């Protein structure tokens, strides 16, 4: 049964008040604070109907009511409908110096978002598959140390310090450096690993044994490109919420943030402008008392990662959606400006 306008206004008021106070709300509170133009008795009857319809819940013996996941969903959907119509300008406070390392830029924005919202933020770094490598270069820093610089087709730069037990002959090193760029750039993932694991030794011939350790180290580093990194910030903000004063509940939340494979799935990119999962809408049991607001960040309209906010279902969705959207838009603009020439 669809909600009429009066029920919608009452439900919106209940959710808004509960987000601010964390206390169950009664009909008299709604009548006094929100100028509904109807009696508290009428509001009480409407709230009883909303409870029967699954939008509100009555905790323990309290006379007041709190929103259910379904009630929060109505609230969020209403916000998102209005939000799409708003003209948002990026916040000037986050435009700072350019940082060369891609991951550090994303981490910095996740930290700023956590500081602004006082919530835990999570960011998914892009999975940089080897078939997206534009250039690979080895830079010697010592006889047994070198930096491997990987540049993707989007211009993202990844640096790896390679520590070797044995030094590599300079002639072998230069030959290998040129060979890698010639054979790897623009090739498919399968072709890259096939070359490194099988063909390279034949190509090197007598020099293969001198470069064996280096080749294995390069292979290991390239395989790390296939692993998605998840970064978290503001983890202790959860302790500021009354819902997490219970020590065991707080420990469970912190354990959840250590589960990178779960967070990796939670942060899978979505087609929606902003995706909000509330309580039991989350498919993981560990997330059933939490809400996740997430959106993607891009380089020149190409999705490269996801950034989100995790917290209790009682969160200020309107403010958090706004802050997340503004921050992600600014992050995308910065990344696009840095890597524009490389795409």
UniProtKB/Swiss-Prot annotation:
GO terms assigned for molecular function: DNA binding
Keywords: Repressor, Stress response, Transcription, Transcription regulation
Listed GO biological process terms: negative regulation of DNA-templated transcription
Source superkingdom: Bacteria
Family: Belongs to the HrcA family.
Biological function: Negative regulator of class I heat shock genes (grpE-dnaK-dnaJ and groELS operons). Prevents heat-shock induction of these operons.
Protein name: Heat-inducible transcription repressor HrcA
Annotated source species: Caldanaerobacter subterraneus subsp. tengcongensis (strain DSM 15242 / JCM 11007 / NBRC 100824 / MB4)
